[in-house]
């Protein structure tokens, strides 16, 4: 399972090259290693639902796995780029790949810069909570145990080339 990535979007504005290097080139390095060894039974890439771009809040149905990718920031663009590389390796070299598109995970031992823990700590200190944009954005969150259970199911699927929304 390929979880490795730069994910904290605020850091993107400080050093966007690291996002490209880690999320695209890092994925390329892993894919090449898998191709060269020929020993990989399954390559599960962990992506993000942000590759879909902005979702209409009035939509009855959310994004489907076959929905067009319309990333809106460099983070989601690098994850979409990595997905394109992965599918190319699947088609060109027969690498057995699966992509899982998740969203924000929360739970114990979360990084301090992640939103839920960051807001809790700031609120406990009576500090201002930073809001990006006009504050109308909505995000989904998954509890870490639920994510683990989901990846356990995906790990045992034999549907190579498929994308799953988590």
Model regions: which residues?
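Alpha-helix initiation/capping motif
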Residues: 67-75, 108-112, 140, 166
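Hydrophobic pocket-lining residues that define ligand/cofactor binding sites across diverse proteins
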Residues: 34, 90, 123, 154-155
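N-terminal Rossmann-like NAD(P)+-binding domain of SDR-like oxidoreductases, especially those catalyzing
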Residues: 1-105, 145
């Amino acid at each position: 399972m390929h979880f490795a990535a730069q994910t904290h979007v605020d850091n993107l504005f400080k050093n966007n090259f690291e996002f490209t290097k880690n999320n695209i080139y890092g994925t390329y390095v892993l894919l090449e290693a898998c191709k060269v060894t020929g020993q990989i039974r399954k390559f599960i890439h962990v992506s993000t639902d942000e590759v879909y771009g902005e979702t209409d809040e009035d939509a009855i149905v959310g994004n489907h796995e076959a929905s067009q990718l319309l990333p809106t920031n460099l983070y989601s663009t690098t994850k979409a780029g990595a997905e394109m590389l992965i599918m190319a390796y699947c088609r060109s070299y027969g690498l057995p790949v699966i992509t899982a598109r998740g969203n924000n995970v929360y739970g114990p031992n979360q990084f301090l810069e992640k939103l839920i823990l960051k807001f809790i700590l700031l609120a406990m200190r009576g500090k201002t909570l930073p809001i990006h944009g006009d504050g109308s954005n909505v995000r989904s969150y998954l509890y870490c145990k639920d994510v683990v259970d989901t990846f356990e199911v995906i790990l045992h699927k034999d549907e190579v080339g498929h994308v799953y929304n988590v």
